[in-house]
């Protein structure tokens, strides 16, 4: 089983690479941008892991991967990468260029990579797509996250279209909606971490390994599980 994970060198991406690499029958291909040392470490640590350079800010880099995908025979695609920062500023202070940049550096790569993988999946009449979203799209998102949540909401809706259009090809498209995780991507001050932990129902923050466990289970489920969303947020927001 060939699995492509975008953004796999750190945080949740790395946790998913390590979790899935423990299954010998899986061949993991993950993309990385700047973290070459981490990418090489993962390649050297697991015989069934392959790193591939990818920069969401570079269309040529995206196209190189897209052109390579037909030769990779991807059975499972995990869309995890996000270019940019989650936290921005209030909507009325947000420059329009922030929205267009987020679209060009996240939605366009998502579309191109997913379309390329769908081509092989349709031919073999099997495939699984897992899209990492955020629990912030449930109910009302926190202030200052308009660009990030709008981008993730776009992918969330595309996932619904994909599952509807390609279910007849035995292809599933599901979403995982994790809460905040203390990773480099979502780095905040120590006092903010303490506040979030104190306010959390379990008094502890979600860890990447916990989300990786859910993803590992999700890709084993029946093709009947299609168009489903899996919030991982200790019921802080309920769908």
Question: Which sequence ranges carry the predicted segments?
Answer:
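Catalytic Tyr-X3-Lys loop
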Residues: 92-112, 126, 130, 155, ...
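Conserved glycine-rich cofactor-binding loop
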Residues: 9-10
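Short, small/polar-rich loop/turn modules that mediate ligand/substrate recognition or access, typified
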Residues: 167, 172, 225-228
């Amino acid at each position: 089983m060939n699995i492509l994970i975008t953004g796999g060198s750190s945080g949740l991406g790395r946790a998913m690479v390590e979790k899935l690499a423990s299954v010998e029958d899986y061949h993991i291909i993950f993309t990385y941008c700047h973290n070459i040392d981490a990418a090489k470490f993962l390649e050297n640590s697991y015989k069934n892991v392959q790193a591939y350079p990818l920069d969401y800010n570079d269309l040529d880099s995206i196209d190189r991967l897209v052109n390579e995908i037909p030769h990779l025979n991807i059975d499972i695609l995990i869309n995890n990468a996000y270019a940019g920062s989650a936290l921005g500023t209030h909507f009325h202070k947000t420059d329009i260029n922030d929205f267009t940049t987020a679209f060009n550096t996240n939605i366009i790569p998502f579309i191109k990579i997913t379309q390329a993988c769908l081509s092989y999946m349709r031919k073999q009449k099997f495939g699984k797509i897992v899209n990492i979203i955020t629990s912030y799209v449930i109910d009302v998102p926190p202030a200052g996250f308009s660009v990030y949540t709008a981008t993730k909401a776009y992918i969330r809706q595309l996932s619904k279209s994909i599952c509807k259009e390609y279910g007849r090809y035995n292809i599933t498209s599901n979403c995982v909606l994790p809460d905040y995780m203390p990773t480099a991507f979502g780095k905040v001050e120590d006092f903010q971490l303490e506040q979030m932990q104190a306010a959390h129902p379990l008094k502890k923050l979600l860890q990447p390994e916990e989300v990786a466990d859910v993803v590992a289970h999700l890709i084993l489920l029946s093709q009947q599980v299609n168009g489903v969303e899996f919030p991982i947020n200790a019921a802080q927001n309920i769908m």
